[in-house]
């Protein structure tokens, strides 16, 4: 009986150690979610992280963030989605939250052409803050449930993405839960693949950078 108890204790300790190792293997990815006012950024995050939709609009003040754990390409990922306010008066303040980001989502309202043009300004801002290092970035045409295909925008969206170095674009609807999971999972894949390539060529590991990603405000050295 005594030896059986010891065996159970050993098994329990081993299970705890395995769980700890699994937690240690998870990496954190900080994703910026930006775009002009009332494009549905918060609704996209709420739909993705909590699978709910609030039709009543409430603007984000400054910055907020939500988290979701997922597994992609055999890698456990803690995804941190940073909801950046779209109001111009918060522009200078919110840029300090760009530091240590691994990727970005730029959102525009498919029913408002001005927000499509505003997406370029956000991409230019990100490129400037990251010294034109081409941070993995996707473009979301949100509220597509309010339009009838084929969708038309001030510029051809394929050409627009190529010229402004977006990795991909997606048609999304937070209300109808369309395209959001696919978009964010694809962005994570792009990030993981890019760092796998970097790791092979330089020995750099994504986890090295992830450890420096914080959930508290830190002042950016490259963008203000």
From Swiss-Prot:
InterPro entries: P-loop_NTPase, Small_GTP-bd, Small_GTPase. Coiled coil: none annotated. GO terms for molecular function: GTP binding; GTPase activity. Keywords: GTP-binding, Lipoprotein, Nucleotide-binding, Prenylation. Residues 1-22, 203-224 are annotated as: Disordered. GO terms for biological process: intracellular protein transport; melanosome organization. GO terms for cellular component: endomembrane system; mitochondrion; trans-Golgi network. Pfam families: Ras. GTP binds at residues 35-42, 83-87, 142-145. Residues 209-224 have a biased composition (Low complexity). It comes from the Eukaryota. A lipid is attached at residues 223-224 (S-geranylgeranyl cysteine). A motif (Effector region) lies at residues 57-65. Gene3D superfamilies: P-loop containing nucleotide triphosphate hydrolases. Belongs to the small GTPase superfamily. Rab family. This is Ras-related protein Rab-32C. It comes from Dictyostelium discoideum (Social amoeba). The gene is rab32C.
